Curated annotation (Swiss-Prot):
Catalytic function, reaction form: H2O2 + AH2 = A + 2 H2O; 2 H2O2 = O2 + 2 H2O
Protein name: Catalase-peroxidase 2
CDD domains registered for this protein in UniProt: catalase_peroxidase_1, catalase_peroxidase_2
Role according to the record: Bifunctional enzyme with both catalase and broad-spectrum peroxidase activity. Shows peroxidase specificity towards odianisidine, ABTS and pyrogallol, but methoxyphenol and 2-chloronaphthol are not peroxidized.
Cross-linked sites for Tryptophyl-tyrosyl-methioninium (Trp-Tyr) (with M-253): W91-Y227
GO cellular component, one term: cytosol
Free-text cofactor note: Binds 1 heme b (iron(II)-protoporphyrin IX) group per dimer.
Signal sequence bounds: none
Cross-link annotation Tryptophyl-tyrosyl-methioninium (Tyr-Met) (with W-91), location: Y227-M253
Recorded family membership: Belongs to the peroxidase family. Peroxidase/catalase subfamily.
Binding sites annotated in the UniProt record for heme b: H268
One GO BP annotation of this record: hydrogen peroxide catabolic process
EC numbers for this chain: 1.11.1.21
Amino acid sequence: MSNEGQCPFNHANGGGTTNRDWWPNELRLDLLSQHSSKTDPLDPGFNYAEAFNSLDLDALRKDLAALMTDSQDWWPADFGHYGPLFVRMAWHSAGTYRMGDGRGGAGRGQQRFAPLNSWPDNVSLDKARRLLWPIKQKYGQKISWADLLILTGDVALTTMGFKTFGYAGGREDTWEPDRDVYWGSETTWLGGDLRYDKGGACESQHGGNAGRNLENPLAAVQMGLIYVNPEGPDGNPDPVAAAYDIREVFGRMAMNDEETVALIAGGHAFGKTHGAGPADNVGLEPEAAGLEQQGLGWKNSFGTGKGADTITSGLEVTWSDTPTQWGMGFFKNLFGYEWELTKSPAGAHQWVAKNAEPTIPHAHDPSKKLLPTMLTTDLSLRFDPVYEKISRHFMDNPDVFADAFARAWFKLTHRDMGPRARYLGPDVPTEELIWQDPIPAVDHVLVDDTDVAPLKETILASGLSVAELVSTAWASASTFRGSDKRGGANGARIRLAPQKDWAVNEPARLAKVLKVLERIQGEFNSTQPGGKKISLADLIVLAGGAGIEQAAKRAGHDVVVPFAPGRMDASQEQTDAHSFAVLEPVADGFRNFVKGKFAVPAEALLIDKAQLLTLTAPQMTALVGGLRVLNVQTGDEKHGVFTDQPETLTVDFFRNLLDMATEWKPIAGEDTYEGRDRRTGELKWTGTRVDLVFGSNAVLRALSEVYASADGEAKFIRDFVAAWVKVMNLDRFDLA
């Protein structure tokens, strides 16, 4: 008898010990291939903008409004209205955004996937999305989950008597979890011990609290929280100390003090928290729950497990006497009572009004009234002197408060969408806001092919080198972040503060190049009939392309770098210098630049930069190899310029790096290397970790071998030009 059927089969394919188990520090090249077409179930030609614009938005709003009071037995609505639940859902979808790297936020519908779908701060939002499913099912691909989550929050506010500032669609769904977002290093939910620099070496962005400095780019105080611990720092119920955390994390998502107060007070005008019983009644999160739960989690064994017995945060607080109607109840209670510390039924720190009458409605029993309660972080708005002044001003001026909350809510839910050019739908507000990084509309006739050729000739005859032309264009365009769609060449903000002064851009050399290009621009524009002009933003990109064409010609290749005019020049008044400061790269491996020394190796920072530029591993490889031989570097060092003919577009970088006649040894620690002739010991090249990784990492070496091969040069030039044009056009949403 065969034993075949009795052999154990313990592990599925793809399981077992992985490369990352063996080598935990392996380079995360997989980050450059996430969200590929292989994970997208929609047809290759599907155009979301067209689909959204065909949507009957009014009908959808009516369906959502009807849902608000259509309480379901399987998950009853608090106070008979789902509005507060959906406000929380939208808030938590958008609230993961952080301005440090632009990641997180509502833009890709990631609340559906791990880890966000299983964060402790998102308990019960699995039910909110299931309540929405019949409506999503009805409208199909005309609205993404990402857009629907935010629209539902907007409708929820409207049905509770609040006038919102506007709504824009345009968020396209992804179909798998993000892998590029760093949420922290803790390995336990609600852990926070690893994200704070206890010695104070890290500098806080928004004021001092010695020994409590949050790691960049994180914008939450504990693993699995959206912002702060509502019980206070590390559970310490100190409203003043909590104000520090609030200011820090809200600041990291681009909110100032007024916006912060407006969001907290406005959001807490509605609904309640849930802590009906001890947390040990709550089961596993969705990602760990059994198949039979069908993607739901946190099954609650306390009482009925729902309604009045719901457990989410463990806090049991209702802020207002009118929790499903916009009003000033939050401020009225906050300043109308003195508060004493108590504990929720689940044992969490919260506050109850002293000497108060029960005025707060019960969420599921109209015959009952409760005492007013608050969170520690609510009291921060009263006991922090800055927040208190703003709060009292809002309390005394309800219209000012309503406008501030409307604007802050719109910013919260649209901050990661990028410029207004990406906004879809009839409800887009007409007012232009500084945080949208506004760029003027095109107001002139654009240049055409008959203008481009002589302009290139003028540029190449200007005395500027290939390296200067290419590096300036790269500096302008490579600020783009695919995370929140900020930055890029459009606007020519390379000539404005703060970008013109960034060390990576070599301000003196940049000023020299810009002066020449501005002269060429002025001479061209002053001689054109019919209102034809070229913006400096366009000219910078055109000049970079001209430099590449010249470098390719020197290598014996005639190429044309595609150029699409249509960029405009922003003004300093349209540029929030503080907001743009976060776009300054701490490292740009494409220019062999690292600003200081970091625990993260330079090659990992290159991957991070490439991922923000939406590049694939082959595109990154082609760009690094090309920029090196074009001598596009920050500073005077020639690290990685593995060629005897710089500013010529060759495959020398790859061929010389892979040449076994060269032996590499580290110098100056681990970050710089010498390449010497293996036989004579003669110094041939110097390189950085970013340079050598293309020969060291097995995957990058395989890609480099393609270009280093005898038949690789023509392909390399094609690939380099294509990747270059991609970066130059990343912010050209009008070309999509």
